[in-house]
């Protein structure tokens, strides 16, 4: 289990800790540590967790901010402040995913000139999607789809989506129904 921790103290120090109980796995065993492992291999059995010193953590990044929106720990503080995945063993099995919410938070925090209360509220309540991962795959597929009649109308409605889920666009409901399963499959490593 992972409880990603963000904290600030009275002195204004900020920190991000990938507060996971990561199994202490053998480095020399080949396995997909991010997936479901077979139960018939004794070399996959582990005993105990890695030391706290080995898990990703960040204190007082130069960006001046940290965030968490179910993102990988390598995108928590901005381009020049983020941890590098190369600094951590792949055996740790740390996820390498971004949710749309994490992509948007990262983008908006990185672009903000001032992170005051108003800016943070705009970022928190942002309803825009990034054309990345499952959204990009779906839209690229729609653009290639040859269709006629009602199917063409539905395709064109989707392609005209304003890429926000604010319940104001004509395509919002259909789009969100369409991307829901793609989003779930992507997050659960079931996307093909």
What are these regions (language model features)?
Residues 7-192:
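Long, compositionally biased non-active-site segments enriched in small/hydrophobic residues and glycine
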């Amino acid at each position: 289990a992972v409880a990603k921790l963000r904290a600030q103290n009275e002195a204004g120090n900020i920190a991000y800790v990938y507060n996971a109980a990561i199994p202490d796995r053998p480095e020399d065993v080949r396995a997909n540590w991010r997936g479901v492992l077979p139960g018939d291999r004794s070399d996959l059995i582990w005993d105990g967790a890695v030391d706290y010193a080995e898990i990703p953590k960040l204190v007082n990044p130069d960006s001046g901010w940290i965030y968490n929106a179910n993102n990988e720990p390598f995108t928590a503080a901005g381009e020049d402040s983020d941890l590098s995945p190369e600094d951590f063993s792949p055996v740790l099995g740390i996820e390498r995913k971004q949710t749309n919410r994490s992509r948007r938070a990262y983008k908006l925090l990185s672009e903000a000139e001032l992170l005051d209360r108003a800016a943070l509220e705009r970022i928190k309540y942002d309803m825009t999607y990034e054309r990345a991962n499952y959204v990009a795959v779906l839209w690229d597929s729609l653009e290639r789809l040859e269709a006629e009649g009602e199917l063409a109308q539905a395709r064109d409605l989707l392609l005209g989506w304003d890429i926000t889920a604010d319940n104001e666009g004509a395509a919002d409901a259909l789009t969100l129904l369409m991307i829901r399963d793609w989003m779930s499959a992507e997050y659960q490593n079931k996307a093909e």
